[in-house]
Amino acid sequence: MSCVQQAAQHRSKPRGNTRAIGMPPIAHHPAPAAPDIAYRRATRGEQPAVYQGVVVARQQGRMRCVQLDQISRGTGTDAGVRNAQRLRGTNAGLIVEPASAGYSTLRHYIARLQRQALAVFEQAQFFGCIDQHIRIRAHAEASARRGKCPHREHAVAQIRLGDRAQTDDRAAGDDRLQFVRIHVRGVHQTPARIHRRVGQQPLHRTLPGPGQAGIHFTLLFGDMDVDGAIGERHQRRQLRRGDRTQAVRRQPKHRIRQRFQAVSAVVQQACETIDAVNQAALRRAGSGTAEIRMRIEHRQQAETDAGVGGRGGDALGHFAGMRVRRTAHGVVQIVEFADAGEAAFEHFHIRLFGDRLQAVRIEPVDEAVHQLAPAPEAVAAASADFGQPRHAALEGMAVQIAQARQQHVAARVGQGSSGTGLQRGDAALLCRDPHPARPAVGQQRPGGPEHLHLLVSHWTPSIAELIVYTYQTPRACAMHCDVLWHNAQLMTLDAADGGLGIVDDGTVACQQGRIVYAGPAAQAPALQPHATHDCQRRWISPGLIDCHTHLVYAGNRANEFEQRLRGASYADIAAAGGGIVATVRATRAADDAALLAASLPRLDAMLGEGVTTLEIKSGYGLTLDDEIKQLRVARQLAALRKVEVVPTFLGAHAVPPGGDAQRYTDQVCTQMIPAIAAQGLAEAVDVFCEHLAFSHAQAEQVFIAAQAHGLHIKIHAEQLSNQHGAELAARYGALSADHIEYLDQAGIAAMAGAGTVAVLLPGAFYFTRDTQVPPIAALRAAGVPLALATDCNPGTSPLTSPLLAMNMAATLFRMTVDECIAGFTREAARALGRSERLGRLRAGMDCDLAIWDIDAPADLVYRMGFNPLHARVLRGHLC
């Protein structure tokens, strides 16, 4: 079957059914939700613009698709119960809440749904248009060999991207000019084992660890069946859809060839784009790849026992078998499907990335599902080639496939065309938890043996699909958005050369908190905003990100400032009972309300200079209860102000008064980190590796405990001396190493190799009157990302101004204007592990903006005591 032909067949299916390999249909004009996950951009091609979720469930033996944007608004258990009661037994689906409200409602809804949820899908939309010289008629799929789509559906084709949209009047006057919407869709972990009372099960798998690739795209489309269509150029065939019969007219030969030529360019570009994403994921993960090639063949086959035979008749679809062989990468599975009738499938390529290879075999069955265990040699190959422990491979590689030989008739409602067994049979992709309960031999899965079931492990990569829908006018496929900022100058921070990515006449469009377009107004797609803002040539940048602060504390250390002016050093003050331990005493004595009241003015000062995201570290409690208190107050700050707070546990900030460093380190690792991770109070663990704090070995002990509990790693390193802490942190994949004034070449090389961000803190350098400048030139030459932060703290950097920190970095560290602005946006997002959705103006990113009254970007760095902020935007909302 051809690629567009298969896409056309998929588009024509009723919305209540899935297509082969478990991919569901979608609505004509989705009103997308915004899941947590953003797809990585490819090296070229359009960028992900809008996200939408789909839940696939089974009802009365048939597959139903549920759009996430159909869920009624609400949060928590009550909303989930209410939605389930209201929608139970209907085809309408879930529905809901914006991603900013989390997935609580969705989890509770699925937990109480009588239908069994089988898969959760996400999709990203791209927008482009057909070149004016390409003439493609509407309903292009009508020329497909067997008339897959009814006339009322939108045409399906593959279109070249990148051309500017035609004007409305030209497009409206010519029905051959069409605009396109392209969807890339992925399936993620299914909430198949949600606890019905509490709804405890995340919808998405955890972040990939070392050696795992975090992104996977698989193309599930073939090419056009041009020859078959030409052979029946004027033939009229009947296509039954329930009680309705529609006649499909074949298009002339030249139109079919013309359409095929138009399709080829974008198919090639789509393949290259998705391959680029896959290769980037593999490079990041450092893992191998294995390919499963499923070759679906067709042949004429008469089934005398069913009374089926002859060309064009109804046929039986069944599996002919599968061969498994080993390769250098592990196992390559070649699957051959034999299908009667008129099916003409092309090759399907499914690539498995990461550390899971699956060895299975396919057997025809009549009434039961047989458990098919992975071949021992395949498990050994997977373990050897991908570094996965053997027991984990055995637990996670349970793949079961059941296919009954049954008769599929072309007239069956919603089962696709004749001769296509895979399309006619309902198919489901069911992702299980890491240790699935395997059914006993003979036990049926929901839906019975007529369904193809593919049970995969928790670590199985996502599957995606490229579909293109064409529209006759720009307005028909206009990109709907909530807010549009226009007549602006942009600093996108998304330039290929690492610069500011300046756009002179720019536009930013936002839909449900995500950017759907950011770039030149002249190249913007057709947009239909609900609200518009004329920026009057002001500058728009990503919202500022302060990636290193100690914002939550009590007390005042102005007396230490006076001591430092008289010549006392940091070590002298600490030895006299001052420094960090002085703030520890004050913070322990303060309750939540006092800490909150003391922290709010500092936070407000940062927000007033365009900060939309900041990290807040603990570290002034040094007991479990007091550290939790600090993290709890950090969460309260995020609830009281429109800002995203990233909490970091810094229990290993200093040794408590009268304590022992090793004994306290053991307490941090065995008591504090497990408790804080269990409560979800922190995303990362930091440690102060210095001769007056924690040693190299103790820092490593903290890192091991943090990784064991799934927390990111950060470090205060080389601030006062070279303890080789940055090199250690890089070895453990740390997000960032901060301060690093005394960093040596070995540490620079380690950070460059690991992608660890260098967080520079000019405020602390200035305030302590340090003379050891961080090795900026060497870091720059090695390609280490350079982030900036205020290091807001009471002792060494009582600074709440990111704009002043930029000026200090330029003046003291000789950083460029571009580096200073990138340090508080793009690179700061990377230091917090949020580069996929923050720090740049790009489709698919969170719509966090700072709008400035300046003449040029250099004004942000050049002027001191100057605040040119005009407006701050968080998730598309003015603050």
UniProtKB/Swiss-Prot annotation:
Q: Where on this chain does N-formimidoyl-L-glutamate bind?
A: Y620, N793, G795
- UniProt cofactor note: Binds 1 zinc or iron ion per subunit.
Keyword Chloroplast in record:
no
Q: What Gene Ontology terms for biological process does this UniProt record contain? A: L-histidine catabolic process to glutamate and formamide; L-histidine catabolic process to glutamate and formate
Please list where the region (Imidazolonepropionase) is annotated: 479-879
Query: Where is Fe(3+) bound in this sequence?
Result: H548, H550, H716, D791
Spans through the membrane: none
| Pathway(s) it belongs to | Amino-acid degradation; L-histidine degradation into L-glutamate; N-formimidoyl-L-glutamate from L-histidine: step 3/3
> What is this enzyme's class at the first EC digit?
hydrolase
Substrates-to-products reaction catalysed: 4-imidazolone-5-propanoate + H2O = N-formimidoyl-L-glutamate
GO molecular function: any one? iron ion binding
Q: Where is this region: Unknown?
A: 1-478
* Required cofactor(s): Zn(2+); Fe(3+)
Span list, region Disordered: 1-32
Keyword annotations: Cytoplasm, Histidine metabolism, Hydrolase, Iron, Metal-binding, Zinc
- Give the EC number(s) listed in the UniProt record: 3.5.2.7
Q: Which domain of life is it from?
A: Bacteria
The cross-references to PANTHER family, in alphabetical order and at most eight, read: IMIDAZOLONEPROPIONASE, IMIDAZOLONEPROPIONASE-RELATED
The job of this chain, per UniProt, is described as: Catalyzes the hydrolytic cleavage of the carbon-nitrogen bond in imidazolone-5-propanoate to yield N-formimidoyl-L-glutamate. It is the third step in the universal histidine degradation pathway.
What is this protein's name? Imidazolonepropionase
Give the originating organism: Xanthomonas oryzae pv. oryzae (strain KACC10331 / KXO85)
Traced from the root, the source organism's taxonomic lineage reads:
Bacteria, Pseudomonadati, Pseudomonadota, Gammaproteobacteria, Lysobacterales
